[in-house]
Each structure stands twice: as C-alpha cells, then as structure tokens.
Amino acid sequence: MPPAARRLAVGPCKKAAGVAAAVVLLTGCGGGGTAEQAAPSSGPAPGTVTTAPDGVQEVTLQTQDDYVFTPDAFTVAPGEVRLTVVNAARQTTHNFRFTPGDGPEAIQPEIPLLAPGERRTIEFTVTVPGAYGFECSFHTQLGQFGTMTVSG
C-alpha cells in the first residue's frame, strides 16, 4: 500500500482514538456528581426544625438545579425563626422570599441572590398562626415554591 493510502486508512483510526482519549481524560477531570455538590452538613436533615441554645427555631432548606425546595413544607411555632437556604445546584442561581400577600402577616427578610454552592441565613419573627407561602421568584413558574405553617 502506498504511504498516502496508509495515512488515509490510519488517519481516521488515529483521530477516533484521539477523540476517545480526550473524552476519557475530560471525564476523569470532571469529577463525580457528589464532588460538585455542596458538602453535606453534619446537622439535621433539611426541613427538620430544631431549637438553638438561644431559643430560636432553626430550619434548613436546600435547592438544586431541579427547581424545588427540599422540603417544600415545614412547620414552626410562633416566635423567632432562623432559616438557612443552601443552594446545592451546580449551575442555577436562586433566591428565597416569602410570597407577598400569601400569609396572615408579612415576613420581610429575604435572600435576593443565592449562587451555586452558597448558603445564607435569615431571621424573622412570626406571631400569627397560619400558612405562609415561600418561593424562588426566578423559578415560581417552574414549581419552586412551598409553605411554612405556623402552628400553636
């Protein structure tokens, strides 16, 4: 076989091997799904309401790239609440606010921006029992909302 014909015959194989090697290399560099997610906390599961030593109720919500809060519902007693939102998404920025007009009383604190990998905490006081809607206002139409119930 003449050298030019051999180059044509071998060229596509070398290209395919090179592409396959690049894919394997890049896949190895990309890491697994858990390495890119926010590190799990050693505290209670998301949505579990606990009472801190200072008497404030604490709850953590988590969100990812799937446009939901985990959990999307939790219950607290009237009083002070410390709410942490963890954005475990790889790509999506979220926010958190209590839906204006969706509850017995207004809750003002909000988290305007929460980039992937960030966690932010707000504190507020609720005195009136009832259901309070919350949302990511960027993704409400995609179903990213939930309910905090104040019971007691």
Please state what every model-predicted region is.
Residues 64-66, 88-90, 101-102, 127-129, ...:
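Solvent-exposed coil/turn segments that connect beta secondary-structure elements
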Residues 95-99:
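Beta-strand signatures of extracellular beta-sandwich domains
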Residues 27, 31-33, 46, 53, ...:
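Extracellular/periplasmic metallocenter environments
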Residues 104-111:
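Surface-exposed loop/edge segments in extracytoplasmic proteins
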Residues 35-58:
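Low-complexity, Pro/Thr/Ser/Glu-rich flexible segments characteristic
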Residues 1-27:
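Sec-dependent bacterial lipoprotein signal peptides
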Residues 72-92, 120-128, 132:
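Beta-strand cores of secreted/periplasmic/IMS beta-sandwich domains, seen most often
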Residues 51-81:
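N-terminal edge beta-strand
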